[in-house]
Amino acid sequence: MPAANIRALEKARGLAADVIILDLEDAVAPEEKDAARERAVRLLPDYAPRETVIRINPAGTPWHQADLEAAAKSGADAILLPKLTDPEQVIRARADARNIALWAMIETPRALFSALAIADAGARCLVLGSNDMLHAMEGRHREDRANLHTAMSLCVLAARAAGITALDGVHNDLDAAQDFRNACVMARDFGFDGKSVIHPSQIAAVNQAFSPSPDDIAYARRVLDAFAREPGKGVITLDRRMLEALDADIAARILARAGL
């Protein structure tokens, strides 16, 4: 959510999103940076009880330190660090971030190949910056995202290795609703925990893709019930399909995601 866009900030109060990210970076012109910073900090309480994150400007820019210090005192749930290239940037930010969690944008080739080190340096969430990554790759947007599959996999694998969250990047075409739904399902199937959006019209599709369906929940319960009926067995069958311990773990994860 651009912290320079007052109308968008007001509308965000009623959005059905799990996390509100107030952006001080790409969506804010240089002459508006200071005002946007003040506005983001001031309006932050308006978005409770949802999780709030402030994306600050990158290290090396004139606004980075002021953004970092203001965000650290803001009461935000996390600070999102963009344009990372190495874990040392996370370590340096940690010194000024107080007790606020750090999220890391994985949007440069160096960040991608250092994703696990960035996570181990203290990031609590990896956010794939697909637009900047494609720009750095000198690639083009594709409907099937085939040129981003490696980046998507590496981002998720690093997050899983570190035991933290991974979020997929944005989808730019607001008119291609089916393409966006497909992108959400793809991100879910790659293992991402959620997806960034750039417009309120995209929220419902993300929530649907990343929320277990009634059929998912019913089957997960059947799996756990089947294991409960045969305690001590490592392998069982259900509907003529072999199930092992990892299937019970998947079922439990589905129910946990559904809040059950």
Regions found by a protein language model. Give the residues of each.
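Expand to "…catalyze enediolate/carbanion chemistry for C-C bond making/breaking, isomerization
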Residues: 1-260
